[in-house]
């Protein structure tokens, strides 16, 4: 969801930097790449350790939560995403959401986009779901999300969309195909596991994966 469907990765950067600045530290893009896809407690611990912040995980999360309560409701849909989601829904292709976000943060982020997210019938919130024991790059969240599809698809029949290195590795570990739409600053050689890497979701051609090319139908499921 974050950075792929919504522009919330930019909002996370603002929030994390606001906390880091209090201690004269910088939340770098390299650190951002390291934590993307992790569960809340995991990324908080990583940031605290890397920046040597004098905070507990709970203190860090509490402070950033106050910032995100203002930022997240202003989230925007990324280019090409709404077109694809509505297209797949129209052709009755099962679509799920596998986000490392908590349910509370999810609700903040989608306040202005509820109709679109209602089309994602099968949802998994990694930071709120006790079944998701480990965040990305472990495959847990994708395995749990895929199990919610009524047709119980084989892993190779599931197509994952991701923007993070951790997410790509998680999908690959789950045995799934994965299309990566990364931040333009990312070194793409760091994601050799990606089935396909695109500059934008606007560039995605569904027919390459047996999905309806805006006129055909296929049994593949997506997360």
Q: Language model features by range: what are they?
A:
Residues 1-33:
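Active-site neighborhood of HAD-like aspartate-dependent phosphohydrolases
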Residues 4, 99-101:
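Conserved phosphate-coupling serine/threonine residues in phosphotransfer and NTP-handling enzymes
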Residues 5, 77, 95, 160:
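Conserved SAM-binding loop
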Residues 19-20, 39-53, 109, 145-147:
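Helix-loop "lid/cap" segments that line or gate small-molecule binding pockets
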Residues 21, 89, 172:
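Anion (oxyanion) recognition and catalysis
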Residues 46-86, 91:
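Metal-dependent phosphoesterase signature
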Residues 86, 102-223:
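Asp-based, Mg2+/Mn2+-dependent phosphohydrolase catalytic module
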């Amino acid at each position: 969801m974050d950075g792929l469907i919504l522009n919330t990765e930019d909002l996370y950067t603002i929030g994390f930097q606001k906390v880091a600045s209090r201690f004269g530290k910088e939340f770098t893009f390299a650190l951002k790449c390291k934590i993307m896809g992790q569960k809340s407690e995991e990324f908080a611990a990583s940031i605290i350790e890397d920046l040597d912040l004098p905070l507990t995980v709970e203190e860090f999360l509490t402070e950033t939560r106050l910032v995100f309560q203002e930022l997240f409701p202003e989230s925007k849909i990324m280019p090409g995403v709404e077109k694809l989601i509505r297209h797949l829904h129209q052709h009755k292709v099962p679509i799920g959401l596998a986000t490392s976000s908590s349910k509370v943060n999810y609700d903040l982020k989608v306040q202005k986009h509820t109709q679109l997210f209602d089309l994602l019938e099968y949802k998994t919130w990694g930071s709120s779901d006790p079944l998701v024991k480990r965040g990305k790059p472990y495959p847990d969240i994708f395995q749990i999300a895929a199990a919610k599809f009524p047709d119980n698809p084989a892993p190779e029949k599931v197509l994952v969309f991701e923007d993070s290195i951790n997410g790509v590795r998680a999908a690959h570990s789950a045995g799934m195909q994965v299309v990566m739409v990364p931040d333009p600053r990312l070194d793409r050689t760091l994601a050799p596991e990606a089935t396909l890497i695109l500059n934008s979701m606007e560039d995605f051609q569904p027919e390459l994966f047996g999905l309806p090319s805006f006129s055909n139908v296929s049994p593949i499921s997506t997360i």
